[in-house]
Amino acid sequence: MVIQLYKTYTPSTRNGTVNGQVKSTRGKNLIYGQHRCGKGRNARGIITARHRGGGHKRLYRKIDFRRNEKDIYGRIVTIEYDPNRNAYICLIHYGNGEKRYILHPRGAIIGDSIVSGTEVSIKIGNALPLTEMPLGTAIHNIEITLGKGGQLARAAGAVAKLIAKEGKSATIKLPSGEVRLISKNCSATVGQVGNVGVNQKSLGRAGAKRWLGKRPVVRGVVMNPVDHPHGGGEGRAPIGRKKPTTPWGYPALGRKSRKRNKYSEKFILRHRSK
C-alpha cells in the first residue's frame, strides 16, 4: 500500500491521505445491490449498536472464500478497492471461463497465476488443505468447518501460522495471539492479506469518517447522569467511581466478554492476547 498526500489547500487536505493506486471496477455477475441495514438499530428503531449509521451507498462484491475451483489455474486481472472491507480484492479469470473475486494476498501482482487443490505448490495465493502444508507456513482465509469457506484471518494485514499437526487436527496461531485446533482437512490460503498499512491512513476530516458509516463518539463524562454513569456534576467533574464503567454499568477496562461455556472452548489451547 502506497500512502499519498494531498497538496495543502485546506485543513482536511493537509491532514488527509489517500491511496491512489487501487480503483474499483464493476465485474458482471459479481457485484449486486444490498439492503442497507448497518444503522445500528433494531426493528423498533432503537439504537442497539452505538456509533453506526449513515455512510455512502455500497454495492456488494461477492467474494470466493471457498476457493472451490479445484486444480484450475487462474490469473489475477485486477486489484480493486472494496468498500465492504479494509482489505483489497483481486479479480481472477480461471481457465474454464469462470470469474471470481478473492482477497488480495500481500505480494501478489497483476498477471500472477494461482490455483487451489490438494497437490499444489506452496505459493502466495494458492489454497490447499492444512495437511498438505509444511509447519511454519504463513496463511490466511482459514476454514473452521470443512467446505464452509474461510472465516479466520481475513482482515487487511492479517496472517496466521501453522505451528503443529497431530492426529486429525492442526494447531494454528491466529493474529490475535490465540492458539487453537482446526481439522487438518480444512483449507487455507498461503500468505498474508494485503493492504498492510491501512492503519497508517489518515482520514483528515470528520466527513470522511461519516462516509464510512461511523457516527461521533461522545465521552460519558460530558453526558447527563441519565445517559451515562460517568455523567453529571458541576463543571468539569471526575467520573465519581473507582473504575470506569460502560453505559450499562459494567467494568469498562479488562472485563472478559467471552462466554465461559462456549462450545469452541475445548479447541482453544491458549486464549488471545490482544
UniProtKB/Swiss-Prot annotation:
PANTHER family under this entry? Answer: LARGE RIBOSOMAL SUBUNIT PROTEIN UL2M, RIBOSOMAL PROTEIN L2
Annotated keywords:
Chloroplast, Plastid, Ribonucleoprotein, Ribosomal protein
**Locations listed in the record:** Plastid, Chloroplast
Q: Where is this region: Disordered?
A: 224-274
What is this protein identified as? Large ribosomal subunit protein uL2c
Oligomeric and partner information: Part of the 50S ribosomal subunit.
Which lineage ranks, top first, belong to the organism behind this chain? Eukaryota, Viridiplantae, Streptophyta, Embryophyta, Tracheophyta
| Molecular-function annotations in GO | rRNA binding; structural constituent of ribosome; transferase activity
Q: Does the keyword Chloroplast apply?
A: yes
Recorded superkingdom: Eukaryota
Q: Does the keyword Signal apply?
A: no
